């Protein structure tokens, strides 16, 4: 079933990412922390924001595996989330839905420091 991109305007509950930044995961993991610490939200991978353009992902299952791995290692405690492959304009993308959590604050943990983000 196609994903309704028109329903998701980038704002406080939605963030678009052209691709998974593995060398700079902080760029999207801080959004995971912020969504978990507030009202939840979606990170949609495979969509450029400015101008909005669906570019898709070459290997969405690998992206899903890496997202799951990095969230478990870098967000403390691990938030509630759902990650799934979605079709947008005929291209494979990934929707990471982060739910607000009962155990906040949720921290981005890296190199001995813990930082909580909010939106």
Feature roles, as predicted:
Residues 1-119:
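Conserved N-terminal catalytic/coupling substructures associated with nucleotide/phosphate chemistry
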